[in-house]
Amino acid sequence: MKASMYLALAGLVLLFVVGYASESEEKEFPRELLSKIFAVDDFKGEERGCKGFGDSCTPGKNECCPNYACSSKHKWCKVYLGK
């Protein structure tokens, strides 16, 4: 059962990569794909002035980013729904 799930997942990933490659007009597809995959690492070095979703915070202080609020119960930034 596990093997068939992994095989199906690998097939979907392969289908996605082949579909993306067929639509790509550039010759440097592997390098472009890898740079897009690992581009997330560039954002880790940046510091924000506010805390994002799931970051610990102190209730009463305005530490969370816009659209987030510090939960007094859990003491981490949650999405503010206006309640």
Swiss-Prot record:
One of its GO terms (cellular component) is host cell presynaptic membrane. The presence of a 'disulfide through disulfide knot' structurally defines this protein as a knottin. Residues 22-48 form a propeptide. The keyword Signal applies. PROSITE patterns: HWTX_1. Expressed by the venom gland. Belongs to the neurotoxin 10 (Hwtx-1) family. 15 (Hntx-3) subfamily. InterPro entries: Huwentoxin-1 (IPR011696), Huwentoxin_CS1 (IPR013140). It comes from Cyriopagopus hainanus (Chinese bird spider). Selective antagonist of neuronal tetrodotoxin (TTX)-sensitive voltage-gated sodium channels (IC(50)=1270 nM on Nav1.1/SCN1A, 270 nM on Nav1.2/SCN2A, 491 nM on Nav1.3/SCN3A and 232 nM on Nav1.7/SCN9A). This toxin suppress Nav1.7 current amplitude without significantly altering the activation, inactivation, and repriming kinetics. Short extreme depolarizations partially activate the toxin-bound channel, indicating voltage-dependent inhibition of this toxin. This toxin increases the deactivation of the Nav1.7 current after extreme depolarizations. Keywords: Amidation, Disulfide bond, Ion channel impairing toxin, Knottin, Neurotoxin, Presynaptic neurotoxin, Secreted, Signal, Toxin, Voltage-gated sodium channel impairing toxin. Negative results: has no activity on Nav1.4, Nav1.5, Nav1.8 and Nav1.9 sodium and calcium currents. The modification Leucine amide is found at L81. This is Hainantoxin-III 2. Disulfide bonds join C50-C65, C57-C70, C64-C77.
